[in-house]
Amino acid sequence: MQQLGATRRYAASDLVGFLACEHLTQLDLRALDAGQAPAAADDEQMALVQAKGQAHEQAWLERLRARHPDLADVTRAGPDLAARLAATRAAMAAGAPVIYQAALCHGPYVGHADFLLRTECPSALGDYGYEALDTKLARSPRASFVLQLSFYAWLLEHAQGVAPRSMHVVLGSGRELALRVADYAHYLRQVLRRFEAAIAAEPAPPTYPEPCEHCPQCRWRVACEARRVADDHLSLVAGMSRQQARRLNAQGVATLAQLGA
């Protein structure tokens, strides 16, 4: 999420983060309210993963550019969001066969799809429309990919007047999967409702930095680890699951000191 002047913008990554850890969302909101940006610790492994992801995306870009020399590259519009949105709208109106790094917006939500692919399905644009495609390093599909692509499809629906039929992901193996947008539209609406309720709640709902699968890639992981150490949290016990910790909490055991007493 970003604060751009008086406007607060939310991206697909905010929805993915919210589903993984509601504490992450609250930390991001507090940082924006304080006019601060969350600081991520240096992580060579994450930097390597990001570099590999960019290389995978670039390889697919070159493959599509070889097929479609008139591919529209929105990155040429520069980093300004308004310029990228305008460049994307212009490329869609012109009927570009492929649009790279398309910027889409509806209300407070912004998305940057790796690619938009032209299809011959009529829309408000004319006798054609677009579907989103993202590249991912993983070798099998994940729920977060589906949520992200569903979000882009929803933004596309507002941009072209009709929902795209399919959304696509290219995995690290090079395999391309097509998913029906309609199969996941209800799921996205549920996530949006929950997310909007959480960010609008006054006072903010109480959350805690419980360890989860998202932690290794989270910008708040150092702060959360420090909080758990300061609290003598049960998650510091090797192999302690969240369910086991909850059972102990129900018995009045909330810290390592209490566990060892």
Specify the residue positions occupied by each region the protein language model found.
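Metal-dependent nuclease catalytic cores that hydrolyze phosphodiester bonds in DNA/RNA
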Residues: 1-125
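Short helix/loop capping segments that flank catalytic or ligand/cofactor-binding pockets
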Residues: 27-28, 113, 124-126, 143, ...
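Short cysteine/histidine-rich zinc-coordinating motifs and their immediately flanking basic loops
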Residues: 33, 227-238
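Active-site ExK catalytic segment of metal-dependent nucleases
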Residues: 101-103, 112-118, 127-139, 148, ...
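Secondary-structure transition/capping motifs at alpha-helix termini
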Residues: 121-128, 158-162
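Metal-dependent nuclease catalytic regions and adjoining charged, substrate-binding loops involved
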Residues: 136, 140-143, 155-229
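Accessory alpha-helical DNA-binding modules that contact the DNA backbone or grooves
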Residues: 231-232, 240-261
